[in-house]
Protein backbone atom coordinates (compact mmCIF):
# COMPACT_ATOMS: atom_id res chain seq x y z
CA UNK A 1 0.00 0.00 0.00
CA UNK A 2 1.92 3.03 -1.27
CA UNK A 3 -0.15 5.41 0.85
CA UNK A 4 1.22 3.88 4.07
CA UNK A 5 4.99 3.90 3.74
CA UNK A 6 6.99 4.31 6.93
CA UNK A 7 10.69 4.68 7.63
CA UNK A 8 12.68 4.17 10.77
CA UNK A 9 16.30 4.16 11.78
CA UNK A 10 18.54 4.17 14.80
CA UNK A 11 21.34 6.70 15.30
CA UNK A 12 22.64 7.67 11.84
CA UNK A 13 19.70 5.68 10.46
CA UNK A 14 17.38 7.97 12.42
CA UNK A 15 19.05 10.90 10.70
CA UNK A 16 18.38 9.21 7.35
CA UNK A 17 14.71 8.70 8.28
CA UNK A 18 14.08 12.37 9.13
CA UNK A 19 16.11 13.54 6.12
CA UNK A 20 13.99 11.25 3.94
CA UNK A 21 10.83 12.75 5.42
CA UNK A 22 12.14 16.25 4.69
CA UNK A 23 13.14 15.28 1.14
CA UNK A 24 9.79 13.73 0.26
CA UNK A 25 7.89 16.50 2.04
CA UNK A 26 9.72 19.13 0.00
CA UNK A 27 9.13 17.10 -3.16
CA UNK A 28 5.39 16.93 -2.41
CA UNK A 29 5.16 20.69 -1.88
CA UNK A 30 7.07 21.41 -5.10
CA UNK A 31 4.71 19.12 -7.02
CA UNK A 32 1.65 20.71 -5.37
CA UNK A 33 0.85 17.36 -3.82
CA UNK A 34 -0.72 17.48 -0.39
CA UNK A 35 0.94 14.25 0.69
CA UNK A 36 4.50 13.10 1.08
CA UNK A 37 5.47 9.62 -0.09
CA UNK A 38 6.54 8.94 3.51
CA UNK A 39 3.44 8.65 5.68
CA UNK A 40 5.34 8.34 8.98
CA UNK A 41 8.89 8.19 10.33
CA UNK A 42 10.36 7.03 13.62
CA UNK A 43 13.73 8.36 14.71
CA UNK A 44 15.62 6.41 17.34
CA UNK A 45 18.72 7.74 19.06
CA UNK A 46 19.40 10.85 16.98
CA UNK A 47 18.17 14.38 17.56
CA UNK A 48 20.94 16.54 16.09
CA UNK A 49 19.09 17.19 12.83
CA UNK A 50 15.75 17.92 14.46
CA UNK A 51 16.20 21.54 13.42
CA UNK A 52 13.66 23.93 11.93
CA UNK A 53 15.55 23.92 8.62
CA UNK A 54 14.84 20.17 8.32
CA UNK A 55 11.46 19.94 10.07
CA UNK A 56 9.79 22.70 8.05
CA UNK A 57 9.78 20.41 5.00
CA UNK A 58 8.42 17.33 6.79
CA UNK A 59 4.87 16.33 5.91
CA UNK A 60 4.91 13.00 7.78
CA UNK A 61 3.93 11.83 11.25
CA UNK A 62 7.01 11.74 13.49
CA UNK A 63 7.94 9.51 16.38
CA UNK A 64 11.14 10.09 18.36
CA UNK A 65 12.89 7.85 20.83
CA UNK A 66 15.94 9.16 22.66
CA UNK A 67 17.77 7.31 25.42
CA UNK A 68 17.68 9.29 28.67
CA UNK A 69 21.28 8.27 29.40
CA UNK A 70 22.57 8.61 25.83
CA UNK A 71 26.34 8.97 25.99
CA UNK A 72 26.26 11.43 23.08
CA UNK A 73 23.80 13.77 24.79
CA UNK A 74 26.60 16.27 25.50
CA UNK A 75 26.16 17.33 21.84
CA UNK A 76 22.51 18.28 22.41
CA UNK A 77 21.57 21.91 23.04
CA UNK A 78 21.02 21.39 26.79
CA UNK A 79 23.92 18.91 27.06
CA UNK A 80 21.73 16.12 28.45
CA UNK A 81 19.29 13.43 27.35
CA UNK A 82 16.12 14.71 29.05
CA UNK A 83 13.68 15.28 26.21
CA UNK A 84 10.99 17.04 28.26
CA UNK A 85 12.65 20.43 27.82
CA UNK A 86 15.07 19.68 24.98
CA UNK A 87 14.81 22.20 22.14
CA UNK A 88 15.21 19.30 19.71
CA UNK A 89 12.09 17.53 21.05
CA UNK A 90 10.14 20.77 21.40
CA UNK A 91 10.83 21.63 17.76
CA UNK A 92 9.47 18.24 16.66
CA UNK A 93 6.25 18.59 18.64
CA UNK A 94 5.77 22.26 17.78
CA UNK A 95 6.37 21.55 14.07
CA UNK A 96 3.08 19.66 14.02
CA UNK A 97 1.04 22.29 15.85
CA UNK A 98 -1.09 24.96 14.23
CA UNK A 99 0.85 28.20 13.83
CA UNK A 100 -1.93 30.03 15.71
CA UNK A 101 -1.31 27.97 18.86
CA UNK A 102 1.37 28.99 21.36
CA UNK A 103 4.54 26.94 21.24
CA UNK A 104 4.87 24.30 23.94
CA UNK A 105 7.61 24.78 26.51
CA UNK A 106 7.56 21.19 27.79
CA UNK A 107 6.99 17.88 26.01
CA UNK A 108 4.76 15.36 27.73
CA UNK A 109 6.67 12.17 27.03
CA UNK A 110 4.61 9.40 25.45
CA UNK A 111 1.78 11.77 24.48
CA UNK A 112 0.60 11.78 20.89
CA UNK A 113 0.27 15.36 19.67
CA UNK A 114 -1.29 16.49 16.40
CA UNK A 115 -3.44 14.69 13.88
CA UNK A 116 -2.53 11.43 12.16
CA UNK A 117 -4.68 12.13 9.09
CA UNK A 118 -3.07 15.55 8.60
CA UNK A 119 0.33 13.90 9.16
CA UNK A 120 1.06 16.27 11.99
CA UNK A 121 1.11 13.56 14.68
CA UNK A 122 4.16 13.80 16.92
CA UNK A 123 5.31 11.71 19.89
CA UNK A 124 8.53 11.69 21.91
CA UNK A 125 9.78 8.84 24.09
CA UNK A 126 12.72 9.03 26.49
CA UNK A 127 13.48 5.50 27.66
CA UNK A 128 15.84 5.18 30.66
CA UNK A 129 18.76 3.44 28.96
CA UNK A 130 21.96 3.99 26.99
CA UNK A 131 22.05 4.73 23.26
CA UNK A 132 23.50 1.40 22.03
CA UNK A 133 20.80 -0.59 23.84
CA UNK A 134 17.80 1.12 22.23
CA UNK A 135 17.44 -1.35 19.33
CA UNK A 136 17.67 -4.27 21.79
CA UNK A 137 15.37 -2.96 24.49
CA UNK A 138 11.83 -4.30 24.82
CA UNK A 139 10.31 -0.98 25.93
CA UNK A 140 11.95 1.03 23.15
CA UNK A 141 10.90 -1.57 20.59
CA UNK A 142 7.33 -1.66 21.95
CA UNK A 143 7.12 2.15 21.70
CA UNK A 144 8.18 1.98 18.06
CA UNK A 145 5.68 -0.79 17.28
CA UNK A 146 2.89 1.17 19.01
CA UNK A 147 3.74 4.25 16.94
CA UNK A 148 3.45 2.46 13.61
CA UNK A 149 0.35 0.53 14.67
CA UNK A 150 -1.26 3.83 15.69
CA UNK A 151 -0.39 5.90 12.62
CA UNK A 152 -1.30 3.08 10.23
CA UNK A 153 -4.48 2.17 12.16
CA UNK A 154 -3.24 -1.41 12.40
CA UNK A 155 -4.56 -3.64 15.15
CA UNK A 156 -2.28 -6.61 15.70
CA UNK A 157 -3.44 -9.62 17.62
CA UNK A 158 -0.13 -9.49 19.48
CA UNK A 159 0.72 -6.96 22.14
CA UNK A 160 3.68 -4.70 21.27
CA UNK A 161 5.28 -6.02 24.44
CA UNK A 162 4.95 -9.65 23.23
CA UNK A 163 8.43 -9.93 21.74
CA UNK A 164 10.49 -13.05 21.22
CA UNK A 165 13.17 -11.69 18.90
CA UNK A 166 15.60 -11.35 21.83
CA UNK A 167 15.65 -15.15 22.18
CA UNK A 168 16.50 -15.47 18.50
CA UNK A 169 19.42 -13.07 18.93
CA UNK A 170 20.62 -14.87 22.04
CA UNK A 171 20.30 -18.44 20.76
CA UNK A 172 21.40 -18.03 17.15
CA UNK A 173 24.39 -15.71 17.30
Language-model regions: role of each:
Residues 163-167:
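Individual transmembrane alpha-helix segments
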Residues 172-173:
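Conserved small/polar residues in nucleotide/adenosyl-binding loops
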Residues 1-162:
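Soluble extramembrane regions of membrane proteins in the secretory/endomembrane system
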